[in-house]
Amino acid sequence: MKVSVLEYISYALFPRRCALCGKVVAPDMPVCGSCESDLEYVKGDLCPHCGREKKYCSCSFHRRFFEAQTAPFYYSGAVKRSIHALKFNGRTQNADGLARFMAQSVKENFAGVKFDFVCCVPLSEASYKKRGYNQSALLAKRIAK
C-alpha cells in the first residue's frame, strides 16, 4: 500500500483509533486485533422484530410498533465495553465507530429501503443533565449520514 506524504503526516498527527476501545490502529484497520477477536457477530435465521432465533420467536402473539430491526453484534465483550464507555464515561468518540458498524448492518439488511427518518430513544431529563448528551442521539445522527 503506497502512502502519500500528506497521508503519512496526517496519520502521524492524528492516528486512527480502534472504533471500540480507542487504541491506535493501522490506517486501514477499523478495530484493533484484541477487539476484533472479541466481536460476536449476529448471524442466523433471526426474527426481524425481536432478534430471537425464529424457532423461539413469539412475535406473532404480540403487537409490534416497528417493521424490523438489525444489529451487527451481540451486546457482549468489546461492544458492551464500548457502549458502556459511551454512555457512562463520556467517551463520545466511541459513537463514530459504533455508528459505522450499525450503518453497515442497516445497509446489508435493508438494501433498497428508503427511510423517512432515523430517530433515537429519548433520554430522561435527569440522565441528560448528568451526562450532558444523549448517546442514542449521537448514534442516530451518525447513522443518518
Can you say where each PLM-predicted feature lies in the sequence?
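Glycine-rich phosphate/pyrophosphate-handling loop used in enzymes and phosphotransfer proteins
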Residues: M1-K145
